[in-house]
Amino acid sequence: AEDLSAVRARAEETLASLMKQRTILNVRKKKRRALYDALSDAEALAPARDCYESGMPGMEEPFARYMDAVSALEQCGIHREQLMAEKAELYRQLADVNREIRRARKEISMCDTIERNRPQMEHDIHVAEAKAKEVERDEYRRR
């Protein structure tokens, strides 16, 4: 029971630390959200630019969004490649932290399950030990 509570306490400390880490990463993501959205829009709407320039009707709105995205990226002063690498790294870190959070929560859940089932497990162990002693006595008598 003491070992179980120690494992649970460590898992809860780890979870709290991971939650703080995730909050920090989410704040960083939120600060750059406009740039990350512009990066995605510029990439996704590049074909709309070609269509607009070739005179295809109905491409005014996507082209305007494309131009807004390109303008935002040019004004930020960060190269697109650097911004893409930063975004990819941030999302990778978030995925890693989220995976660790799920693992810590699963560990806490297992501790809860073990604690809930402990009385029954202890009972089963006592029954098995008593049965083993009984078998041992019977074998001793037969000799």
Regions found by a protein language model. Give the residues of each.
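Extended intrinsically disordered terminal tails
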Residues: 1-143
